[in-house]
Amino acid sequence: MARKNQKAPWEEEEEIIWVSKTEMKNDMEDLQKLGEELVGLKPSVLAKFPLSDDLREAINDAQRFKNEAKRRQLQFIGKLMRNEDPEPIQLALDKIRNKHSQATAALHKLETLRDRMIEEGDAVIEEVMVKYPDADRQRFRQLARQAKKEKASNKPPKAFREIFQILKDLYLNEDL
């Protein structure tokens, strides 16, 4: 006779997580969209991603296909993605996106620095000299004066552009 408070070993309670069919479909669509993003990447960038050989081959095929064949191949890529762990792939994709936004932000900072250099003059040039000791102080002063004159006389902003190019070169060489 079984006791009331005890359960049989085969009746152990497990936490069962039920996933609705709609939620499963949405997950599959997300994987397919991730696959579409991978198809849009250049082969040199794609080589850096942690992908299985089958998935890499399917992505290369999809890059060659057109229209309906490409649509079917994208669905196949979505199916292959179900067997992959999407997190490392998503992280690598986010890193690429973030790199572009960081570069854009850096260029915006350089533009602001250039504008301040033209408006405020020597004080900002000194800031630049501290940050980039290899910079030519005299050249910056000369270009800042020239940019002010060009702006006042409504001439093309040649010095304005040249200051930005010098700052950009200094910024890019700083990373090396």
From Swiss-Prot:
Protein name: Dual-action ribosomal maturation protein DarP
GO BP field: assembly of large subunit precursor of preribosome
Cell compartments where the protein resides: Cytoplasm
Chain's gene name: darP
InterPro entries: DarP (IPR006839), DarP_sf (IPR023153)
Purpose of the protein: Member of a network of 50S ribosomal subunit biogenesis factors which assembles along the 30S-50S interface, preventing incorrect 23S rRNA structures from forming. Promotes peptidyl transferase center (PTC) maturation.
Keyword list, A-Z: Cytoplasm, Ribosome biogenesis, RNA-binding, rRNA-binding
Family the entry assigns: Belongs to the DarP family.
GO cellular component, one term: cytosol
Keyword Cytoplasm set for record: yes
Major site of localization recorded for this protein: cytoplasm
Keyword RNA-binding: yes
GO molecular function, one term: rRNA binding
